[in-house]
Amino acid sequence: MSREEPPAAEHPPAQEKTQQQERESQRERERLATDEALALAAQAGIHRLAIPTPFMVGRVNAYLIEDSPLTLVDSGPNSAKALDELEQALATRGHTVEDIELLVISHQHIDHFGLASILARRSGAEVAALDRVAPFLASYGQEAELDDLFAERLMLRHGIPPEVVTVLRAVSAGFRAWGAAVQVTRPLTDGGELALRDRTLRVLHRPGHSPSDTVFWDEQRSIMLAADHLIAHISSNPLLARPLTTDRVGGAPDFVGGAPTAEHETSPTPRPRALVTYIDSLEKTRAMDLKLVLSGHGRPITDHVALIDERFRLHRRRAEKIGRLIAAQPRTAHEIAQELWGNVAVTQAYLTLSEVLGHVDLLLRDGTVTEEEQDGVVRFRAASL
C-alpha cells in the first residue's frame, strides 16, 4: 500500500551532512526574511504577538495595531498560559489588556477567538467580526455541539468506524473549553471598511479554511492580515464545517447535494465543498497587489503569488493521485485517507477526511468521478466505470 509521504531513504554520511547544511541554510534565510518582514510591519504600526496554543499547529499569531483605536486582531485560545503570554507581549509594547479599544476576530476557530470574551470584559473594547459569524460567536457552546453532530454524521457516512467517531466526539468536546462565547458589537460586512485614525482596512470574506475566514487589507501599505487564509509553512486545511447561520438562511456557494437548508446542521447532506470554495478565495487573493501577508501561524509571506501557485499545484497533484486510487477500485473517503496516510492518530481522522473530500469534490466538479451510497455509506468510483 503506497503512502503519500514515505520514510526517507538512507543516505551516505556525507550526503546527510550536505542536506543538513542546506536545511540550516534555508532556516537562516527564512529567519532573516521573517525579521525583515516583521520590521516592515512594525514600521506600519503592526506588531506580531505569538500566543501559545494546546494544538498541533503551535503558536497562533495575534496582531497589535498601534493606531486609534488601539486594535488587536485575534486573541489566542482561552487558557491561562495564552493570557499570561499575551499580557507579557502587550507589556513589551507598553500596553495592558485594559488599553485595547478594538478587538477584531478573523474567523470562528477557537485558537483565534477563545480569549476574546475575557479581553472584551476587561478592556471594554468593541468586538468586530464578520456579520455572518456573529451568531456563531454569541452562541458558541450550542454551535459547537451542532458542529460535533454534523461532523459525527459526516464521518459515519464516509466510512470512519463508529468507535473512532466516538473517540473524536469526546476529544472535540474536550476542546470546547479553549473557546468561549463572545458578543460581536461591531459587525463587519464583506467589502466594507474598518476605519482607524491612520489607516483603513478593507474587510474581505475569504471562506474555505472555515466558512467565516476574513482578511483585512491595508491597500495604502499593500499589507494584508490574512489569519489562516494563507500560511507559509503549511497548506491551510479546508475543514468541512456547517455553513454559518446566515448562509443557511440566505444561501451559500458550492454545496454538494443542493442548496443548504435549515436542517443542514443535523443532516449529512448537503455538505459544503470547502476546497472548491477555498481555491476560489485564493484566486481572488492571488490577483491582489500585496507586499506583505501577515498570517495566523508562522512567518510572514512576501510573495503571495508564488505561494498560492504552489498551493494550486499541491491540490492538483493530490486530486490526481486520489483520482488514480478511485480508478483502481471504488473507495470510501476513509479508505482513501488510509491509503494516502496509513493509520494516522485518531485525533487527525477528521482532518484527513476533510482533505480527501475536498480533493474528491474537485474530481466531482470535473466529472471524472461519481459517488454512490449503499447502507448509509458513500463510495466514490471512476465516472467511466
Residue ranges and their predicted role:
Residues 42-50, 170-178, 197-199:
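Short Pro/Gly-enriched beta-strand edge/turn motifs at strand-loop
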